[in-house]
Amino acid sequence: AAVIAPAISYDRANSLYGILSEPAATNLLLYSRDFSTGWQDSGTLTANYAVAPDGTQSAARIVDSGAGGTGYVIARRAVTLAASTTYTISAYIKQDQLTYAYIGTDSFTDGPITARFWVNLASGTIGTVQTGWSNVSIVGLSDDWYRVSGQITTGSDTAGRIGIFGAEADNTVLVNLDGTSSILIWGAQAETGTVATSYVPTYAA
């Protein structure tokens, strides 16, 4: 369940602004910063690997399996959403060995069937945005973290998956499985509406 607490804002230098006044939001992604529980991880996930945007040692690192060839670096979770509803999906992502990342949906039969958008984690810029996503944003925080967000609208199929992926370049989905391809992630969120509100930690249902 979501933790109910006042939303706190920080600037790029991680200095406290104060309590935010913003719409109430529910984070629909359970275990939203514990990517080892209920998430499909491709590769090796190390929990509590790095300092997260909130200053705690709670950010995760995902690195490829080292199996050779090409494949994915991914944390993906199954979701059940409402039909014909607009959602904002967001996550905090930081470059590690990989300097690109993308957020994607899949397994929906209509609406955002398989749709992705890419960001450059070195320059803080938006790359390719596929049909199904809108209002894509990347906001720089302290210590090279970015909050990345985008908006989707569901169709009649409400069951699908949302994933955070590492990438080697814009508009590419596969990485070299050499044991070094990695990104840092924290604070995934899915909420109704058109705005990424302050991150709400979640745990069990």
Put a short name on every predicted segment.
Residues A1-A205:
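Glycine- and acidic residue-enriched flexible segments with recurrent GG/GxG motifs
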